[in-house]
Amino acid sequence: IQWQDGNGTGYHINIVDTPGHADFGGEVERVMSMVDSVLLLVDAVDGPMPQTRFVTQKAFSQGLKPIVVVNKIDRPGARPDWVIDQIFDLFDNLGATDEQLDFPIIYCSALNGIAGMDPEALADNMDPMFQAIVDIVEPPKVEVDGPFQMQISALDYNSYVGVIGLGRIKRGSVKPNQQISVISVDGTTR
């Protein structure tokens, strides 16, 4: 997502969705290895679901600090205070650190594209959520000048372009159509 703050500063924010169910544990772990933080999306009426526990545990095991997003805040019966209490209890039961227990909260209606730091004072857009991401999440630490290195989290194949690697750049940079080598764990190059 390309986003510009109120001062005109532009940001590129990568948002990666992950399945919420334990049945997709491997996929969740792959996604967690590519991110610097997590947006934990929780319904303003229902609160944390059983699968929330699984995904949150994976985030904590990676040392990530969640940003809690209470969605559907405009829904009849929304109970944000109860939801936040439930999230705090969940985090505590999962052994969250003090830093993880001091989680930021954003309230939103994703369907209506509105967000805010207070459930009673939402902006007419999602800017408060993006601003919170920019303010809270540190940019990735990448050695831009070094030789290209990417941690591959998943491989795919396309008959037109060949092997497609999804992952996180750890060092250097890559340009469109640039040829690269894939080095396997055993050192073989392809």
Regions found by a protein language model. Name each.
Residues 6-13, 18-25, 32-82, 143:
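Conserved Switch II/interswitch segment of TRAFAC-class P-loop GTPases
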